[in-house]
């Protein structure tokens, strides 16, 4: 599953783990995306959506 929201296009962000000695190693932050059944253009479709879009009501979930 792609770690990208199909509504807001939020994806993986990159950065560093920083130790107390200021050593840096690469790491990634993944968005909290979930596969939900949603109404898209009047039809029920399975899409990948981040939880922020779910909470803000940008997606109408199918029953």
UniProtKB/Swiss-Prot annotation:
Keywords: Ribonucleoprotein, Ribosomal protein. One of its GO terms (molecular function) is structural constituent of ribosome. Gene3D superfamilies: Ribosomal protein L28/L24 (2.30.170.40). It holds the Pfam family Ribosomal_L28. InterPro entries: Bacterial_rp_bL28, Ribosomal_bL28, Ribosomal_bL28/bL31-like_sf, Ribosomal_bL28_bact-type, Ribosomal_bL28_sf. The keyword Kinase does not apply. GO terms for biological process: translation. One of its GO terms (cellular component) is ribosome. Signal peptide: none annotated. Belongs to the bacterial ribosomal protein bL28 family. PANTHER family: 50S RIBOSOMAL PROTEIN L28, LARGE RIBOSOMAL SUBUNIT PROTEIN BL28A. NCBIfam families: L28. This is Large ribosomal subunit protein bL28. It comes from Symbiobacterium thermophilum (strain DSM 24528 / JCM 14929 / IAM 14863 / T).
